[in-house]
């Protein structure tokens, strides 16, 4: 990921972001930091970039010309399609979800104001996002830019090294982080809680959750209220049909899903990153009312829907133009114990990088979206099985969290490589505290057989993966009645 910072004080940015974890990430090529001095683009021979504001007032204002020319220089490096973030107290409050959204961009341009601000005309011309880090005034935008870059960069694959840690920290899933302790076991009469010394990971997990809940209830009741609503929805779906609703349960548990609707009649969850809506109507009579809660699809864009009941389809078709509908079953690994590992010592499973894009696209035909597959590779979510150093197959994790993309090359089949790949992904998700699940296209007996072998349970009910766009298909009239 590439960060471009337009500033009058480049040394402040460079010094602040070249140490510790971010400094290492820059050196290892996980992120790049391009700091551009606005003063270098002024047409004033004295390098002046500010002037008095029209209408009077205290202080000086940064002029439009040097900012615009500086922006154009940065935009040329990005292809001119990057989001431009202006740091201002007037902007939207920065939060973790916003950091996650920005982390999916390839390039970000930060514009740092100073003095009394920047000429409004250039802001209207180039800025896409106005962001604030709090209701207070600073001397410039450099510190807010560094705060945002730190929060965003740590979500980029490879930056933290331990990828799991980004998922289990303060603000994850509407909970504050649990208390943590290090050596010695006793300090100034204060002892480490006994449960943390027990080695019982189940007890430790339960204790940490209880501590997170207690802290959130005490310090952030606003967050805890949202957490309780999510937990109520999760418990409702568990009781009704755990296998059928595991994708929705996990979306909420992992902090991905946003509740659009939650009632006794049904639930809608939106995964903004995946541009996906998961829908469950507990009674057929609620399908129309539930579908009406869906927001409109923007023109020329596509949205995906997972329908957990077939009777939702007719109401979805009344609102949107259905492009495709695929029936499938959900396979869920309900155990907490790891699956046995590789069948052969000469088999190595590791993440694939972008260099394997063409090969993956050539062998995997279910998804032919090159941009999607590139994003999955860049984020480290496709794993390859190498037999004696040669790629023999691969599997991956889809954006919304399901396991899939399993493909073993024909010459390597019937050697247990597919099972080894799936076992590796299952164990990875178990280590994150997730419940592994995947989607099996209806009547795919070969895949169903593998899931049974791996110990996964299949939902009896059929789900439907639907692609849709704005508008509805025009009604095709039947034959004219005979006269």
Regions found by a protein language model. Give the residues of each.
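Short amphipathic alpha-helix that is part of the acyltransferase structural core
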Residues: 229-246, 328, 335-370, 482-483
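Conserved acetyl-CoA-binding loop-helix of GNAT-fold acetyltransferases
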Residues: 285-294, 414-427, 448-449, 453
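Conserved active-site alpha-helix within GNAT-family acetyltransferase domains
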Residues: 310-322, 442-460
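N-terminal charged segments
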Residues: 228-315, 361-366, 370, 374-375
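Conserved catalytic-core motifs of GNAT/GCN5-like acyltransferases
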Residues: 321-334, 455-474
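Structured adenosyl-cofactor binding patch, chiefly the S-adenosyl-L-methionine
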Residues: 122-164
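S-adenosyl-L-methionine/SAH cofactor-binding core of RNA-modifying enzymes
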Residues: 63-114
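A conserved beta-strand-loop-helix scaffold within acyl/acetyltransferase catalytic domains
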Residues: 371-410
């Amino acid at each position: 990921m590439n960060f471009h910072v337009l500033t009058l004080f480049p040394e402040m940015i460079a010094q602040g972001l070249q140490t510790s974890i971010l400094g290492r990430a820059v050196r290892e090529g996980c992120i790049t930091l391009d700091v551009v001095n606005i003063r270098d683009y002024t047409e004033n021979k004295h390098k002046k970039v500010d002037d008095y504001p029209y209408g009077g007032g205290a202080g000086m204002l940064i002029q439009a010309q040097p900012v615009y020319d500086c922006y154009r220089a940065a935009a040329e490096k990005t292809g001119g399609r990057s989001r431009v973030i202006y740091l201002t107290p007037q902007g939207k409050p920065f939060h973790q979800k916003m950091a996650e959204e920005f982390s999916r961009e390839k390039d970000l341009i930060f514009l740092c104001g100073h003095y009394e601000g920047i000429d409004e005309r250039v802001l209207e011309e180039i800025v896409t996002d106005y962001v604030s880090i709090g209701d207070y005034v600073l001397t410039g935008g450099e510190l807010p830019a560094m705060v945002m870059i730190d929060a965003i960069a740590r979500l980029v694959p490879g930056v933290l090294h331990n990828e799991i840690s980004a998922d289990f920290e303060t603000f994850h899933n509407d909970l504050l982080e649990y208390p943590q302790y290090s050596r010695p076991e006793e300090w100034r009469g204060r002892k480490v809680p006994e449960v943390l010394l027990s080695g019982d990971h189940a007890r430790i997990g339960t204790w940490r959750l209880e501590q997170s809940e207690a802290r959130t209830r005490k310090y952030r009741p606003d967050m805890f209220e949202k957490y309780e609503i999510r937990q109520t929805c999760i418990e409702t779906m568990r009781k009704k049909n755990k296998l059928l609703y595991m994708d929705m349960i996990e979306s909420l548990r992992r902090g991905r899903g946003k509740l659009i609707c939650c009632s006794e009649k049904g639930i809608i969850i939106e995964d903004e990153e995946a541009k996906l809506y998961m829908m469950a109507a507990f009674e057929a009579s609620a399908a129309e009312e539930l579908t009406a809660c869906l927001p409109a699809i923007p023109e020329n864009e596509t949205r995906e829907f997972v329908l957990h009941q077939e009777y939702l389809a007719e109401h979805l078709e009344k609102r949107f133009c259905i492009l495709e509908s695929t029936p499938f079953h959900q396979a869920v690994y309900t155990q907490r114990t790891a699956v046995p590992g590789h069948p052969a010592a000469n088999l190595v499973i590791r993440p694939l990088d972008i260099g394997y894009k063409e090969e993956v696209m050539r062998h995997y035909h279910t998804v032919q979206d090159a941009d999607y597959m590139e994003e999955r590779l860049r984020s480290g979510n496709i794993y390859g099985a190498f037999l004696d150093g040669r790629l023999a197959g691969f599997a991956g994790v889809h954006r919304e969290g399901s396991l899939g993309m399993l493909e073993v090359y024909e010459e390597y089949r019937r050697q247990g490589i597919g099972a080894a790949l799936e076992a590796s992904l299952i164990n990875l998700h178990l280590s994150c505290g997730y419940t592994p699940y995947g989607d099996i296209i209806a009547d795919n007996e070969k895949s169903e057989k593998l899931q049974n072998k791996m110990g996964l349970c299949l939902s009896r009910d059929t789900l439907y993966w639907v692609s849709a766009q704005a508008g509805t298909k025009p009604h095709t009239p039947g034959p004219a009645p005979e006269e």
